Amino acid sequence: MSSFLVQTAVVRLFLLGVVFWFPFALSSSCAEIASKFGTWKSEGDAPPSYLSPTVDLLDGLDRIRKKIINGTISSQYDFDNLLHRLISQANDGHLQIGLCSREIFRFQHGTPLTSVSREGLDLPQLYVHSDAVIMHSGQVEAISPVVEINGLEADYYLQSRIAVTLGYQDPDARYNALFPSPSAGFTGTYSAGAWASNSGEWPGSAVLTIRFANGTRLEVKPTATWPATNGPMNYTDGQALFEAACLPGTSSKYIFGSFPGMYLGLPAYELPRSGPSVFPAPTIKDSNGLVRLYSLEDAALQDVAVLQITSFRIGGEDSREFSATIRQSLDWASSHGKTKLLLDLSGNEGGNVIPGFDLFRMLFPDEPIRSETRFRSTELLDVLGQAFSAEYRGADAKEILDPPLAAQNAVSPDQEENVFGSWKDLFGPDPNYEGDSMSNAYAVFSFAAASTTFEPISGYGSAPLAIKTRLFEPQSIAVVTDGRCASTCAIVVGLLQAQGVRTVTFGGRPRKAPMQAVGGVKGGQRWSLRTISRHIKTARELLAKQYTSTAAQANSTRRLAVGHLLQKLNDLAPPALPLIPRMEDNEWEFALRFDTYGQSSVNFRDAYVPANETTPWQFIYEAADCRMFLTPENVVDPASRWNSAARAMFGGREMGSEKCVDYVSV
């Protein structure tokens, strides 16, 4: 085990005795806990036009609980995978849960696939990624497409076994996520795609058999990686590993998952090139490499600049540099004769929304930002809102941007202040909202309060207007994606589309039909389970303080009301999680540890668009203006996608818009 990269034979001998036969006495309580956290999820029923199947999470949790009781589930690992698959069926990137046995080993293999159209207009086929590279070199005769995996039609296997677990609301985005991502290297994420990683899950077989159209076969053998963060691999049986990974109260000096570092050892295979190694040198970039400006080499496209933004996961001082780099890039492009702009957001999974708003304002400094959100009006949120709104008043309220449960903080979708006179005015429920019990509409937050010189939204709060006039008109801007645009990325694209900016997207399922540019979550706000725990803890402290206050002592009616709220909070709230990852175990209030790395979350607020203020934006289908299949050149040289996109979006029909698979409005 010293290499920490365990070959398949060892995986079978060791893991079948350790992971797959974990002790299993506590998982029913874990399912009950998950159901309490599940009540925070904001979205309701999807309309018939929604492309992905819907799932009743609470009913699913109840079915899992029954399987535990009747003995159908036999191990902790089986339970954790079943719960993970249920959560993933919501196709909501903001809804995630980190389960203890799934965070021990990461399974993967070294044979990534890719979906390629040989000429760009014919339907793409599946190829081993290395074969696509050979195809690009011209050796087409030696290459054969993949037609089967483990005896099943290959596309069916990939979409039904793996893609359904990936959390994107759009099936084309899920399909693209199966394959290598050239932008993954900028953010340090796995570059080979979900087919090669199986989301870290045991694939169910020690050998995966690929059959090619020419009749040949290839056996793929998964391996397991032991993360260095788990500490030394010195466990001799399943009981010992279970106690370390899943039970609080470890006697170790370090809590499982708290060791520094990433993964020990290197894969026994080469990952597809990604990040800076596969893109040309940028003209301008930030120190984190998340913002990069390029010019196109094609002589016919010298008036086109490309601004590539691979993530919005930044904060603090990095936010200021992020903003300054975008401003510098736009200024440079404008001053060097660039009249057209491609904004490449491929693989951008979102992050901090403030830099996203700032980007929009630098492109459209004369346009105010409108944001509309709602939360589900539940009993528990009502208790929290009453606690926070009663405590934070006047100037104090302005200091509290999160939680957005103090009515004094809330502003209208158009940033009007003082529109909610009480918590009831915000909580609702809105009588005009049909079908679900939802709050009244309000903005993400007050931009005037949130925007600072360190974390600016151009022209709001203390941040000056970074760019005073438009440098590019809407018809001269196009957004490029691979469908894997989510959260803050989705918000940015939505704001740009409202101004008339067009979108072009690459890849997707092998069908000649439209594809969405934004295939990831389009929720209004993600709350981690630790955030929820922090708000519950604070609300409990505030109510206890109010209960013993002088005012309550003098007013028995008020004291009784506060006591009732405190009791209701204790009845409805889920058990507390540690407020930071890997906190001391005495913070835990239930018997199983989960969320070791602090990634579990729910979608707290829905987002809405002006054209439809009663259907969550998550459920609204929005086709890209142009869709393109990936050619071998696009796979090997991802920067070539910019040439294709620019010719399609800016060149007119004579320059190549016929290459759009589904022509909508170019």
Swiss-Prot record:
Pathway: Mycotoxin biosynthesis. Pfam families: PDZ_CPAF_rel, Peptidase_S41. Peptidase S41 family protein; part of the gene cluster that mediates the biosynthesis of the phomopsins, a group of hexapeptide mycotoxins which infects lupins and causes lupinosis disease in livestock. Within the pathway, phomP1 and phomP1' are probably involved in the processing of the phomA and phomA' precursors. The pathway starts with the processing of the precursor phomA by several endopeptidases including kexin proteases as well as the cluster-specific S41 family peptidase phomP1 and the oligopeptidase phomG to produce 10 identical copies of the hexapeptide Tyr-Val-Ile-Pro-Ile-Asp. Its EC number is 3.4.-.-. It comes from Diaporthe leptostromiformis (Lupinosis disease fungus). The keyword Metal-binding does not apply. InterPro entries: ClpP/crotonase-like_dom_sf, PDZ_CPAF-rel, S41A_metabolite_peptidase, Tail-specific_protease. The lineage of its organism: Eukaryota, Fungi, Dikarya, Ascomycota, Pezizomycotina. It comes from the Eukaryota. One of its GO terms (biological process) is proteolysis. Residues 1-27 form the signal peptide. Keywords: Glycoprotein, Hydrolase, Protease, Serine protease, Signal, Virulence. Belongs to the peptidase S41A family. Glycans are attached at residues 70, 214, 234, 555, 612. GO terms for molecular function: serine-type peptidase activity. This is Peptidase S41 family protein phomP1. Residues 303-504 are annotated as: Peptidase S41 domain.
